[in-house]
A protein has these predicted regions:
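Conserved anion-binding
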Residues: 12-14, 18-19, 97-170, 174-175
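Glycine-rich, proline-tolerant flexible connector loops at the mouths of alpha/beta enzymes
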Residues: 46-64, 104, 169-180
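Structural preference for beta-strand elements that scaffold enzyme active sites
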Residues: 5-9, 46, 74-78, 99-101, ...
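Conserved, mostly hydrophobic/aromatic
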Residues: 11, 39, 47, 79, ...
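Catalytic cores of alpha/beta
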Residues: 73, 77-96, 185-221
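Glycine-rich phosphate-binding active-site loops on the catalytic face of alpha/beta enzymes
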Residues: 91-112, 172-177, 203-209, 217-236
């Protein structure tokens, strides 16, 4: 049986880990290198590092901090933010990332997905999609959730998977930071259309939210930030709870 994964997320702005709600109201939390070290020791299955303002500010991702983070951990590291070209993929992978997350860059130039998959393999290309309901439709947002692209999220995600994305990280803007549970309706809609590992992001508030999430078909991992950063829920405690309730975890 394939084990499920618990993934903490470091949203980094100006070299610091930050956290907001519904992608707004960003507050400073901690140093990313210290947090990466802590999560590695705490039993996280993977770590996600997002430079959350790189795309909006039209610049490249912070490679100096990323290199330090990568050197401190021994679990898979996925990195995103400001990834717009194959050169960006190269730079991020050379810093120590295992997988590269692409979001706004693919929306600007969809050919980036098949080109990256051809060069590095599908397993290296993670589609990150920021999704929000607009007039009853799931829509894709760009630039850190600031810009409505007008694209149907389900169609966009399906296209990316068909063209080389090997994993999907689905960020629900509607549930982000609210701590009332994952966006199961959106996740189910995506899982019914694609057959790749899906990481659910946005809305985790308690361990029961993860248990409910993993009862839904096609969801491989739960990602969270605030509840882990603020120590409202320990990763080891969460994994032991899930394991005891029939969800296979790596302990």
């Amino acid at each position: 049986m394939i084990t499920k994964r618990i993934i903490p997320c470091l949203d980094v702005r100006s070299g610091r880990v930050v956290k907001g709600t519904n992608f707004e109201g960003i507050k400073d939390v901690a140093d990313p290198v210290e947090m990466a070290r802590m999560y590695n020791a705490a039993g996280a299955d993977e770590l996600v590092f997002y430079d959350i303002t790189a795309s909006a500010e039209g610049r490249s991702l912070f490679t100096d901090i990323l290199t330090r983070v990568a050197s401190e951990i021994f679990i898979p590291l996925t990195v995103g933010g400001g990834v717009n070209t194959l050169d960006d993929f190269d730079r991020v992978l050379k810093c120590g990332a295992d997988k590269v997350s692409v979001n706004s860059g693919a929306l600007k130039d969809p050919s980036l997905i098949p080109a990256a998959a051809k060069r590095y393999g599908d397993q290296c290309v993670v589609l990150s999609a920021d999704v929000k309901r607009v007039d009853g439709q799931f829509r894709v947002f760009a630039k850190g959730g600031r810009e409505d692209t007008g694209r149907d999220a389900l169609e966009w995600i399906k296209w990316c998977v068909d063209n080389g994305a090997g994993e999907g990280c689905l960020n629900s803007i509607d549930t982000d930071g609210v701590r009332n549970g994952f966006d199961l309706e959106m996740l189910d809609a995506v899982a019914a259309r694609v057959n790749i590992p899906i990481i659910a992001s946005g809305g985790a508030g308690k361990k029961e939210d993860f248990l409910e999430l993993f009862h839904h078909k096609g969801i491989d991992a739960g990602l969270a930030a605030g509840i882990f950063h603020q120590k409202l829920l320990g990763i080891r405690e969460l994994k032991e709870y899930l394991n005891a309730n029939g969800v296979e975890m790596r302990l």
